[in-house]
């Protein structure tokens, strides 16, 4: 079992190289840290990623009349045998979301990931400044 803290910073810049830019910051109890960036494009009512780590998309689920569900698919760039489907559930007040990942290798379930998140702020510019980020 891998348990760690994460902070996701999702940006929608008015000007910049891409319309969506996500940075993930991970911290493990032993002090290990990791930072990954995921720039993305919008097209066909989806967010699309294509970078050195993943190729994939995220989209709202139109069958959900409550607009609580987003589905995501991605494949590891260097490993075509491994792909992932993620279901994201957003609370009605927009303050929480839970995510479930199914990692599939060669058509078989390899592992599951469960994530509980809490919304912090819409002011991603202030967070970027606080963290010293530049995109």
Model-derived segments and spans:
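Soluble ligand-binding/transfer domains with enclosed cavities or grooves
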Residues: 1-135
